[in-house]
Protein backbone atom coordinates (compact mmCIF):
# COMPACT_ATOMS: atom_id res chain seq x y z
CA UNK A 1 0.00 0.00 0.00
CA UNK A 2 1.25 3.51 -0.75
CA UNK A 3 2.47 5.59 2.14
CA UNK A 4 -0.05 7.95 3.71
CA UNK A 5 1.10 11.57 3.44
CA UNK A 6 2.02 13.56 6.52
CA UNK A 7 -0.50 16.38 5.85
CA UNK A 8 2.07 18.66 4.28
CA UNK A 9 4.40 18.55 7.26
CA UNK A 10 7.98 18.53 6.04
CA UNK A 11 10.39 16.02 7.55
CA UNK A 12 13.16 17.77 9.45
CA UNK A 13 16.76 17.50 8.25
CA UNK A 14 19.32 15.57 10.27
CA UNK A 15 21.10 18.68 11.54
CA UNK A 16 18.12 20.15 13.37
CA UNK A 17 18.29 21.51 16.87
CA UNK A 18 17.13 19.41 19.80
CA UNK A 19 15.96 20.57 23.22
CA UNK A 20 18.93 21.38 25.44
CA UNK A 21 19.28 18.59 27.94
CA UNK A 22 22.16 19.78 30.09
CA UNK A 23 23.16 22.70 32.29
CA UNK A 24 26.39 23.92 33.83
CA UNK A 25 25.19 23.07 37.30
CA UNK A 26 23.05 20.11 36.27
CA UNK A 27 24.93 17.69 38.53
CA UNK A 28 24.42 19.88 41.59
CA UNK A 29 20.73 20.41 40.82
CA UNK A 30 20.32 16.67 40.40
CA UNK A 31 22.01 15.99 43.75
CA UNK A 32 19.76 18.52 45.53
CA UNK A 33 16.68 17.06 43.85
CA UNK A 34 17.66 13.54 44.93
CA UNK A 35 18.22 14.74 48.51
CA UNK A 36 14.84 16.51 48.58
CA UNK A 37 13.12 13.36 47.29
CA UNK A 38 14.90 11.23 49.88
CA UNK A 39 13.60 13.46 52.67
CA UNK A 40 10.08 13.64 51.21
CA UNK A 41 7.25 11.15 51.32
CA UNK A 42 6.63 12.10 47.67
CA UNK A 43 9.01 9.85 45.74
CA UNK A 44 7.94 10.78 42.23
CA UNK A 45 7.23 13.97 40.30
CA UNK A 46 4.96 12.49 37.64
CA UNK A 47 7.11 13.89 34.84
CA UNK A 48 6.75 13.06 31.16
CA UNK A 49 9.87 10.87 31.37
CA UNK A 50 8.65 8.96 34.44
CA UNK A 51 5.27 8.30 32.86
CA UNK A 52 6.82 7.17 29.58
CA UNK A 53 9.27 4.85 31.32
CA UNK A 54 6.44 3.11 33.20
CA UNK A 55 4.67 2.42 29.91
CA UNK A 56 7.89 1.23 28.28
CA UNK A 57 8.56 -1.18 31.15
CA UNK A 58 4.99 -2.52 31.00
CA UNK A 59 5.17 -3.12 27.25
CA UNK A 60 8.52 -4.89 27.54
CA UNK A 61 7.22 -7.02 30.39
CA UNK A 62 4.16 -8.02 28.37
CA UNK A 63 6.31 -8.73 25.31
CA UNK A 64 8.88 -10.68 27.34
CA UNK A 65 6.21 -12.93 28.87
CA UNK A 66 4.74 -13.66 25.42
CA UNK A 67 8.21 -14.26 23.99
CA UNK A 68 9.17 -16.58 26.86
CA UNK A 69 6.05 -18.68 26.29
CA UNK A 70 6.75 -18.82 22.56
CA UNK A 71 10.34 -19.89 23.16
CA UNK A 72 9.21 -22.57 25.61
CA UNK A 73 6.81 -23.93 23.02
CA UNK A 74 9.57 -23.77 20.42
CA UNK A 75 11.92 -25.83 22.57
CA UNK A 76 9.24 -28.45 23.07
CA UNK A 77 8.82 -28.68 19.30
CA UNK A 78 12.56 -28.52 18.63
CA UNK A 79 12.26 -25.10 16.92
CA UNK A 80 13.86 -22.80 19.47
CA UNK A 81 14.95 -19.44 18.03
CA UNK A 82 18.38 -17.94 18.45
CA UNK A 83 18.82 -14.83 20.56
CA UNK A 84 17.63 -11.69 18.79
CA UNK A 85 20.15 -9.10 17.72
CA UNK A 86 20.81 -6.43 20.32
CA UNK A 87 22.27 -3.86 17.90
CA UNK A 88 20.36 -0.62 17.45
CA UNK A 89 20.03 1.42 14.26
CA UNK A 90 22.22 4.51 14.03
CA UNK A 91 20.60 7.90 14.74
CA UNK A 92 18.73 9.36 11.74
CA UNK A 93 18.21 5.91 10.25
CA UNK A 94 14.74 5.44 8.76
CA UNK A 95 13.02 2.28 9.97
CA UNK A 96 9.63 0.60 9.66
CA UNK A 97 7.68 -0.14 12.84
CA UNK A 98 4.27 -1.43 13.88
CA UNK A 99 2.72 0.48 16.78
CA UNK A 100 1.54 -1.65 19.69
CA UNK A 101 -0.22 0.92 21.87
CA UNK A 102 -0.44 4.59 22.82
CA UNK A 103 1.42 5.66 25.92
CA UNK A 104 0.01 7.94 28.61
CA UNK A 105 2.21 10.68 27.11
CA UNK A 106 0.21 10.53 23.86
CA UNK A 107 2.92 8.92 21.71
CA UNK A 108 2.77 5.53 20.04
CA UNK A 109 4.97 2.70 21.32
CA UNK A 110 6.42 0.16 18.90
CA UNK A 111 8.74 -2.85 19.12
CA UNK A 112 11.02 -3.56 16.19
CA UNK A 113 11.20 -7.21 15.09
CA UNK A 114 13.76 -9.22 17.10
CA UNK A 115 14.31 -6.26 19.41
CA UNK A 116 13.83 -5.52 23.08
CA UNK A 117 13.96 -1.78 22.43
CA UNK A 118 10.74 0.25 22.51
CA UNK A 119 10.45 2.99 19.89
CA UNK A 120 8.44 6.10 20.75
CA UNK A 121 6.62 7.32 17.63
CA UNK A 122 4.42 10.45 17.85
CA UNK A 123 1.16 10.90 15.93
CA UNK A 124 0.47 7.17 15.67
CA UNK A 125 -2.27 4.73 16.70
CA UNK A 126 -2.26 1.02 17.60
CA UNK A 127 -1.85 -1.17 14.53
CA UNK A 128 -0.27 1.55 12.39
CA UNK A 129 2.68 0.37 10.30
CA UNK A 130 4.81 3.47 9.97
CA UNK A 131 8.09 4.82 8.69
CA UNK A 132 10.00 6.66 11.41
CA UNK A 133 13.43 8.23 11.79
CA UNK A 134 15.54 7.30 14.80
CA UNK A 135 16.63 10.35 16.79
CA UNK A 136 18.17 9.10 20.00
CA UNK A 137 18.55 5.88 21.95
CA UNK A 138 18.18 5.55 25.71
CA UNK A 139 19.78 2.13 25.90
CA UNK A 140 19.67 1.74 29.68
CA UNK A 141 15.96 2.54 29.72
CA UNK A 142 15.29 0.36 26.65
CA UNK A 143 13.56 2.99 24.57
CA UNK A 144 14.36 5.22 21.60
CA UNK A 145 12.90 8.53 20.44
CA UNK A 146 11.88 8.75 16.79
CA UNK A 147 10.32 11.19 14.37
CA UNK A 148 7.15 10.23 12.56
CA UNK A 149 7.62 10.29 8.77
CA UNK A 150 4.58 8.58 7.26
CA UNK A 151 2.01 5.83 7.63
CA UNK A 152 2.66 2.80 5.43
CA UNK A 153 -0.45 0.87 6.46
CA UNK A 154 -3.01 2.46 8.80
CA UNK A 155 -4.21 0.54 11.84
CA UNK A 156 -7.90 -0.11 12.57
CA UNK A 157 -8.27 2.96 14.81
CA UNK A 158 -6.76 5.52 12.43
CA UNK A 159 -9.08 7.70 10.37
CA UNK A 160 -7.13 10.39 8.52
CA UNK A 161 -10.36 11.98 7.27
CA UNK A 162 -10.83 13.32 10.82
CA UNK A 163 -7.62 15.39 10.70
CA UNK A 164 -8.58 19.05 10.72
CA UNK A 165 -5.20 20.81 10.65
CA UNK A 166 -2.56 20.89 7.92
CA UNK A 167 0.17 21.05 10.58
CA UNK A 168 -0.87 17.90 12.37
CA UNK A 169 2.08 15.46 12.57
CA UNK A 170 4.47 18.41 12.82
CA UNK A 171 3.07 20.84 15.43
CA UNK A 172 3.48 19.61 19.00
CA UNK A 173 0.06 20.88 20.10
CA UNK A 174 -2.20 17.94 19.13
CA UNK A 175 -1.59 14.19 19.15
CA UNK A 176 -4.95 12.53 18.42
CA UNK A 177 -6.65 14.22 15.46
CA UNK A 178 -6.55 10.91 13.55
CA UNK A 179 -8.51 9.10 16.30
CA UNK A 180 -12.33 8.95 16.54
CA UNK A 181 -13.44 10.90 19.59
CA UNK A 182 -14.80 7.86 21.43
CA UNK A 183 -11.33 6.29 21.11
CA UNK A 184 -9.73 9.42 22.54
CA UNK A 185 -12.04 9.24 25.56
CA UNK A 186 -11.38 5.52 26.05
CA UNK A 187 -7.62 6.11 25.93
CA UNK A 188 -7.85 8.90 28.50
CA UNK A 189 -9.66 6.55 30.86
CA UNK A 190 -6.64 4.22 30.66
CA UNK A 191 -4.35 7.17 31.46
CA UNK A 192 -6.17 7.66 34.77
CA UNK A 193 -6.17 3.92 35.47
CA UNK A 194 -2.44 3.58 34.82
CA UNK A 195 -1.68 6.69 36.86
CA UNK A 196 -3.17 5.09 39.97
CA UNK A 197 -1.55 1.74 39.18
CA UNK A 198 1.92 3.24 38.69
CA UNK A 199 2.10 6.28 40.96
CA UNK A 200 -0.33 5.95 43.89
CA UNK A 201 1.47 3.14 45.76
CA UNK A 202 -2.01 1.86 46.63
CA UNK A 203 -3.14 -1.75 46.71
CA UNK A 204 -5.56 -2.47 43.81
CA UNK A 205 -8.47 -3.07 46.21
CA UNK A 206 -8.12 0.50 47.52
CA UNK A 207 -8.64 2.04 44.07
CA UNK A 208 -12.25 2.04 42.78
CA UNK A 209 -13.01 1.53 39.08
CA UNK A 210 -12.36 4.66 37.04
CA UNK A 211 -15.54 6.02 35.45
CA UNK A 212 -15.76 6.68 31.72
CA UNK A 213 -14.11 9.92 30.65
CA UNK A 214 -16.56 12.81 30.38
CA UNK A 215 -16.19 14.40 26.96
CA UNK A 216 -16.09 17.99 25.81
CA UNK A 217 -19.16 19.39 24.00
CA UNK A 218 -16.72 20.93 21.52
CA UNK A 219 -13.89 18.86 20.05
CA UNK A 220 -12.59 21.77 17.97
CA UNK A 221 -12.97 25.51 18.46
CA UNK A 222 -12.91 25.14 22.25
CA UNK A 223 -9.67 26.69 23.44
CA UNK A 224 -10.12 30.21 24.84
CA UNK A 225 -6.40 30.92 25.17
CA UNK A 226 -3.49 30.44 22.78
CA UNK A 227 0.06 31.76 23.04
CA UNK A 228 1.85 31.59 19.68
CA UNK A 229 5.38 32.95 19.63
CA UNK A 230 8.28 33.88 17.38
CA UNK A 231 12.03 33.65 17.86
CA UNK A 232 14.56 36.46 17.75
CA UNK A 233 16.58 37.39 14.65
CA UNK A 234 19.07 34.77 13.41
CA UNK A 235 22.41 35.23 15.17
CA UNK A 236 20.80 37.25 17.95
CA UNK A 237 22.89 35.53 20.60
CA UNK A 238 26.20 37.17 21.37
CA UNK A 239 28.87 36.02 18.96
CA UNK A 240 31.79 38.36 19.76
CA UNK A 241 32.27 38.00 23.50
CA UNK A 242 31.09 40.72 25.84
CA UNK A 243 30.18 43.31 23.24
CA UNK A 244 27.50 41.33 21.54
CA UNK A 245 25.83 42.18 18.27
CA UNK A 246 22.36 43.62 18.01
CA UNK A 247 20.49 41.95 15.20
CA UNK A 248 17.42 43.16 13.38
CA UNK A 249 14.76 41.16 11.63
CA UNK A 250 15.33 41.07 7.88
CA UNK A 251 12.04 39.29 7.29
CA UNK A 252 8.96 38.24 9.23
CA UNK A 253 9.94 35.21 11.32
CA UNK A 254 7.78 32.08 11.67
CA UNK A 255 4.96 32.85 14.12
CA UNK A 256 3.30 29.83 15.66
CA UNK A 257 4.13 26.83 17.81
CA UNK A 258 6.98 24.39 18.37
CA UNK A 259 7.70 21.55 15.99
CA UNK A 260 7.37 18.27 17.87
CA UNK A 261 10.61 17.31 19.64
CA UNK A 262 12.55 20.42 18.62
CA UNK A 263 13.05 24.08 19.43
CA UNK A 264 12.05 25.13 15.93
CA UNK A 265 8.95 27.31 15.56
CA UNK A 266 6.53 26.40 12.77
CA UNK A 267 4.79 29.27 11.01
CA UNK A 268 1.11 28.58 11.74
CA UNK A 269 -1.50 31.01 10.50
CA UNK A 270 -4.51 29.30 12.08
CA UNK A 271 -5.25 26.83 14.89
CA UNK A 272 -8.56 24.94 14.66
CA UNK A 273 -8.75 24.09 18.38
CA UNK A 274 -8.96 27.82 19.19
CA UNK A 275 -12.33 29.54 19.51
CA UNK A 276 -13.48 31.73 16.63
CA UNK A 277 -12.54 34.88 18.54
CA UNK A 278 -9.06 33.55 19.33
CA UNK A 279 -8.52 32.49 15.71
CA UNK A 280 -9.61 35.94 14.56
CA UNK A 281 -7.17 37.48 17.03
CA UNK A 282 -4.38 35.22 15.78
CA UNK A 283 -4.79 36.46 12.23
CA UNK A 284 -4.84 40.12 13.26
CA UNK A 285 -1.85 39.75 15.61
CA UNK A 286 0.21 38.10 12.88
CA UNK A 287 -0.50 41.09 10.64
CA UNK A 288 0.35 43.52 13.45
CA UNK A 289 3.69 41.86 14.20
CA UNK A 290 4.61 41.93 10.51
CA UNK A 291 3.74 45.64 10.30
CA UNK A 292 5.60 46.53 13.51
CA UNK A 293 8.58 44.21 13.12
CA UNK A 294 11.10 47.05 13.54
CA UNK A 295 9.86 47.48 17.14
CA UNK A 296 11.10 44.01 18.09
CA UNK A 297 14.75 43.36 18.96
CA UNK A 298 14.08 39.82 20.13
CA UNK A 299 11.45 37.11 20.02
CA UNK A 300 8.13 37.40 21.83
CA UNK A 301 5.08 35.44 22.94
CA UNK A 302 1.68 36.66 21.77
CA UNK A 303 -1.28 36.42 24.14
CA UNK A 304 -4.64 35.52 22.60
CA UNK A 305 -7.42 35.34 25.20
CA UNK A 306 -11.14 35.26 24.58
CA UNK A 307 -13.38 37.65 26.48
CA UNK A 308 -17.18 37.61 26.58
CA UNK A 309 -19.66 40.45 26.87
CA UNK A 310 -23.26 39.48 27.58
CA UNK A 311 -25.73 41.64 25.64
CA UNK A 312 -29.55 41.84 25.82
CA UNK A 313 -31.71 40.70 22.92
CA UNK A 314 -33.50 44.02 22.75
CA UNK A 315 -32.18 46.08 21.17
CA UNK A 316 -30.42 43.52 19.00
CA UNK A 317 -26.68 44.28 18.92
CA UNK A 318 -24.98 45.07 15.63
CA UNK A 319 -22.15 42.78 14.48
CA UNK A 320 -18.61 44.16 14.75
CA UNK A 321 -15.65 43.32 12.53
CA UNK A 322 -13.44 42.54 15.53
CA UNK A 323 -16.00 40.40 17.41
CA UNK A 324 -17.97 37.17 17.15
CA UNK A 325 -21.67 37.45 18.01
CA UNK A 326 -23.32 34.30 19.39
CA UNK A 327 -27.05 33.88 19.99
CA UNK A 328 -27.42 32.20 23.40
CA UNK A 329 -31.22 32.15 23.59
CA UNK A 330 -32.05 34.73 26.26
CA UNK A 331 -29.10 36.96 25.33
CA UNK A 332 -26.18 37.41 22.97
CA UNK A 333 -22.52 36.76 23.74
CA UNK A 334 -20.10 39.11 22.04
CA UNK A 335 -16.70 37.41 21.88
CA UNK A 336 -13.51 39.39 21.42
CA UNK A 337 -9.81 38.58 21.69
CA UNK A 338 -7.69 40.34 24.32
CA UNK A 339 -3.95 40.55 23.60
CA UNK A 340 -2.76 42.79 26.44
CA UNK A 341 -1.31 40.85 29.39
CA UNK A 342 -2.57 43.57 31.73
CA UNK A 343 -6.01 43.68 30.16
CA UNK A 344 -9.07 42.06 31.69
CA UNK A 345 -11.23 39.29 30.35
CA UNK A 346 -14.77 38.30 31.28
CA UNK A 347 -16.18 34.79 31.12
CA UNK A 348 -19.56 33.27 32.00
CA UNK A 349 -19.96 29.77 33.43
CA UNK A 350 -23.72 29.23 33.31
CA UNK A 351 -24.87 32.45 35.00
CA UNK A 352 -21.69 32.93 37.04
CA UNK A 353 -19.51 35.80 35.90
CA UNK A 354 -15.71 35.89 36.22
CA UNK A 355 -13.24 38.68 35.54
CA UNK A 356 -9.53 37.92 35.38
CA UNK A 357 -6.28 39.43 34.18
CA UNK A 358 -5.87 38.29 30.58
CA UNK A 359 -2.52 36.69 31.34
CA UNK A 360 -3.66 34.89 34.52
CA UNK A 361 -4.66 31.24 34.76
CA UNK A 362 -8.26 30.29 34.09
CA UNK A 363 -9.61 27.08 32.56
CA UNK A 364 -9.18 27.19 28.77
CA UNK A 365 -12.24 25.19 27.66
CA UNK A 366 -15.41 27.01 28.63
CA UNK A 367 -17.63 24.56 26.74
CA UNK A 368 -17.03 21.82 29.32
CA UNK A 369 -17.04 24.01 32.44
CA UNK A 370 -20.83 23.88 33.09
CA UNK A 371 -20.73 20.05 32.99
CA UNK A 372 -17.55 20.01 35.06
CA UNK A 373 -18.77 22.34 37.81
CA UNK A 374 -22.12 20.51 37.95
CA UNK A 375 -20.26 17.23 38.47
CA UNK A 376 -18.37 18.76 41.39
CA UNK A 377 -21.67 20.05 42.85
CA UNK A 378 -23.20 16.58 42.52
CA UNK A 379 -20.30 14.81 44.25
CA UNK A 380 -18.94 17.24 46.80
CA UNK A 381 -21.41 16.18 49.51
CA UNK A 382 -21.73 12.61 50.85
CA UNK A 383 -24.11 10.36 48.89
CA UNK A 384 -27.56 10.25 50.50
CA UNK A 385 -28.13 6.56 49.69
CA UNK A 386 -25.38 5.25 51.94
CA UNK A 387 -27.84 4.24 54.71
CA UNK A 388 -25.95 6.25 57.31
CA UNK A 389 -27.23 9.47 58.79
CA UNK A 390 -26.14 12.23 56.39
CA UNK A 391 -23.20 14.27 57.58
CA UNK A 392 -23.98 17.91 58.15
CA UNK A 393 -21.28 19.52 56.04
CA UNK A 394 -21.64 23.27 56.33
CA UNK A 395 -18.35 24.66 55.09
CA UNK A 396 -16.29 24.71 51.91
CA UNK A 397 -12.57 25.42 51.76
CA UNK A 398 -11.20 26.04 48.28
CA UNK A 399 -7.43 25.61 48.48
CA UNK A 400 -5.42 26.88 45.49
CA UNK A 401 -8.52 28.96 44.87
CA UNK A 402 -7.11 31.24 42.18
CA UNK A 403 -9.80 33.67 41.05
CA UNK A 404 -12.55 31.74 42.85
CA UNK A 405 -13.99 29.28 40.33
CA UNK A 406 -14.96 26.61 42.86
CA UNK A 407 -15.65 28.91 45.79
CA UNK A 408 -18.20 30.80 43.71
CA UNK A 409 -19.80 28.01 41.65
CA UNK A 410 -20.24 25.81 44.76
CA UNK A 411 -21.32 28.58 47.12
CA UNK A 412 -25.04 27.75 46.90
CA UNK A 413 -24.40 24.44 48.71
CA UNK A 414 -22.74 25.90 51.80
CA UNK A 415 -23.59 28.55 54.38
CA UNK A 416 -19.93 29.59 54.33
CA UNK A 417 -17.21 29.18 51.72
CA UNK A 418 -13.57 30.19 52.03
CA UNK A 419 -11.01 30.45 49.24
CA UNK A 420 -7.32 30.29 50.12
CA UNK A 421 -4.38 31.10 47.87
CA UNK A 422 -0.79 32.23 48.38
CA UNK A 423 -1.20 34.86 45.64
CA UNK A 424 -2.60 38.15 46.92
CA UNK A 425 -3.49 39.27 43.37
CA UNK A 426 -5.55 36.10 42.85
CA UNK A 427 -7.36 36.74 46.12
CA UNK A 428 -8.11 40.29 45.02
CA UNK A 429 -9.75 39.11 41.80
CA UNK A 430 -11.56 36.29 43.61
CA UNK A 431 -13.11 38.82 45.99
CA UNK A 432 -14.14 40.96 43.02
CA UNK A 433 -15.72 37.93 41.33
CA UNK A 434 -17.65 37.07 44.49
CA UNK A 435 -19.09 40.59 44.51
CA UNK A 436 -19.94 40.33 40.79
CA UNK A 437 -22.00 37.25 41.64
CA UNK A 438 -23.78 38.93 44.58
CA UNK A 439 -22.08 36.84 47.25
CA UNK A 440 -21.77 38.61 50.58
CA UNK A 441 -18.36 38.49 52.34
CA UNK A 442 -19.85 36.44 55.19
CA UNK A 443 -21.02 33.86 52.63
CA UNK A 444 -17.94 33.60 50.37
CA UNK A 445 -14.65 35.10 51.48
CA UNK A 446 -11.00 34.81 50.48
CA UNK A 447 -7.69 35.02 52.27
CA UNK A 448 -4.08 35.04 51.15
CA UNK A 449 -2.19 32.56 53.30
CA UNK A 450 1.42 31.50 53.42
CA UNK A 451 1.96 27.92 52.26
CA UNK A 452 3.51 26.98 55.60
CA UNK A 453 0.36 28.00 57.50
CA UNK A 454 -2.40 27.44 54.99
CA UNK A 455 -4.94 26.08 57.49
CA UNK A 456 -3.69 27.94 60.57
CA UNK A 457 -6.53 30.48 60.64
CA UNK A 458 -9.34 28.03 59.77
CA UNK A 459 -12.08 27.97 62.39
CA UNK A 460 -14.41 25.55 60.57
CA UNK A 461 -14.92 22.22 62.35
CA UNK A 462 -13.17 19.53 60.32
CA UNK A 463 -16.11 17.10 60.36
CA UNK A 464 -18.36 19.83 58.94
CA UNK A 465 -15.97 20.83 56.15
CA UNK A 466 -15.10 19.72 52.62
CA UNK A 467 -11.87 20.85 50.96
CA UNK A 468 -11.43 21.29 47.20
CA UNK A 469 -7.86 21.32 45.93
CA UNK A 470 -6.77 22.18 42.40
CA UNK A 471 -2.96 22.46 42.47
CA UNK A 472 -0.59 23.12 39.55
CA UNK A 473 0.84 20.25 37.48
CA UNK A 474 3.52 19.46 40.06
CA UNK A 475 0.76 18.56 42.53
CA UNK A 476 0.77 19.18 46.27
CA UNK A 477 3.95 19.27 48.31
CA UNK A 478 4.84 17.46 51.50
CA UNK A 479 4.01 20.46 53.65
CA UNK A 480 0.51 20.96 52.23
CA UNK A 481 -0.41 17.28 52.51
CA UNK A 482 0.85 17.21 56.09
CA UNK A 483 -1.35 20.19 56.98
CA UNK A 484 -4.35 18.70 55.19
CA UNK A 485 -4.02 15.41 57.07
CA UNK A 486 -3.66 17.22 60.39
CA UNK A 487 -6.83 19.17 59.65
CA UNK A 488 -8.61 16.05 58.27
CA UNK A 489 -11.79 17.51 56.73
CA UNK A 490 -14.74 15.17 56.23
CA UNK A 491 -14.27 15.12 52.45
CA UNK A 492 -11.66 16.11 49.89
CA UNK A 493 -12.26 16.74 46.19
CA UNK A 494 -8.96 16.73 44.31
CA UNK A 495 -8.99 18.28 40.82
CA UNK A 496 -5.82 17.98 38.78
CA UNK A 497 -4.40 18.70 35.33
CA UNK A 498 -1.78 15.99 36.01
CA UNK A 499 -3.39 12.71 37.06
CA UNK A 500 0.03 11.21 37.84
CA UNK A 501 0.84 13.69 40.62
CA UNK A 502 -2.80 13.47 41.69
CA UNK A 503 -2.46 9.69 42.07
CA UNK A 504 0.74 10.16 44.05
CA UNK A 505 -0.89 12.66 46.43
CA UNK A 506 -4.10 10.67 46.82
CA UNK A 507 -1.96 7.67 47.66
CA UNK A 508 -0.43 9.65 50.53
CA UNK A 509 -3.88 10.68 51.80
CA UNK A 510 -5.10 7.08 51.72
CA UNK A 511 -1.94 5.45 53.09
CA UNK A 512 -1.28 8.26 55.54
CA UNK A 513 1.89 10.06 56.66
CA UNK A 514 3.98 8.79 59.51
CA UNK A 515 3.90 11.14 62.48
CA UNK A 516 0.77 12.92 61.29
CA UNK A 517 -2.18 10.53 61.42
CA UNK A 518 -0.61 7.32 62.64
CA UNK A 519 -0.77 5.97 59.13
CA UNK A 520 1.86 5.10 56.54
CA UNK A 521 0.84 1.68 55.43
CA UNK A 522 -1.59 0.09 52.97
CA UNK A 523 -4.85 1.95 53.46
CA UNK A 524 -4.04 2.97 57.03
CA UNK A 525 -4.46 6.70 56.48
CA UNK A 526 -7.41 8.98 57.08
CA UNK A 527 -9.14 8.72 53.68
CA UNK A 528 -10.64 6.28 51.23
CA UNK A 529 -11.35 6.95 47.56
CA UNK A 530 -15.03 7.30 46.73
CA UNK A 531 -14.75 7.92 42.98
CA UNK A 532 -12.33 8.65 40.13
CA UNK A 533 -13.08 10.15 36.73
CA UNK A 534 -11.37 12.03 33.92
CA UNK A 535 -12.64 15.10 32.05
CA UNK A 536 -11.52 15.84 28.51
CA UNK A 537 -10.66 19.52 28.73
CA UNK A 538 -8.34 19.29 25.72
CA UNK A 539 -9.71 17.15 22.86
CA UNK A 540 -7.21 16.08 20.18
CA UNK A 541 -4.42 16.12 22.79
CA UNK A 542 -3.05 13.59 25.27
CA UNK A 543 -4.10 15.60 28.33
CA UNK A 544 -6.84 14.60 30.76
CA UNK A 545 -8.16 16.40 33.84
CA UNK A 546 -8.71 14.15 36.84
CA UNK A 547 -11.28 14.41 39.65
CA UNK A 548 -10.85 12.26 42.76
CA UNK A 549 -13.44 12.33 45.55
CA UNK A 550 -12.19 11.20 48.97
CA UNK A 551 -14.23 10.44 52.07
CA UNK A 552 -12.77 10.36 55.57
CA UNK A 553 -12.84 6.78 56.81
CA UNK A 554 -15.41 5.99 59.49
CA UNK A 555 -12.71 4.87 61.93
CA UNK A 556 -10.88 8.16 61.46
CA UNK A 557 -14.11 10.10 61.96
CA UNK A 558 -14.78 8.21 65.21
CA UNK A 559 -11.27 9.06 66.44
CA UNK A 560 -11.93 12.71 65.61
CA UNK A 561 -15.17 12.65 67.59
CA UNK A 562 -13.34 11.01 70.48
CA UNK A 563 -10.82 13.83 70.50
CA UNK A 564 -13.58 16.42 70.72
CA UNK A 565 -15.18 14.57 73.63
Where are these regions (language model features)?
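A short catalytic or substrate-binding loop motif that flags glycine-/basic-rich loops and adjacent residues
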Residues: 91, 101-104, 126, 218-222, ...
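A short, compositionally biased
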Residues: 102-107, 249-253, 338-343
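Flexible glycine-/small-residue-rich
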Residues: 150, 230, 259, 304-306, ...
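Extended interfacial segments that mediate partner engagement and assembly in macromolecular machines
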Residues: 152-153, 159, 163, 169-290
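Structural motif
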Residues: 112-114, 259, 349
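Terminal RNA-binding accessory module
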Residues: 2-162, 167
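Rossmann-like S-adenosyl-L-methionine
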Residues: 3-16, 22-26, 37-70, 274, ...
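Hydrophobic beta-strand signal
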Residues: 131-133, 227, 303
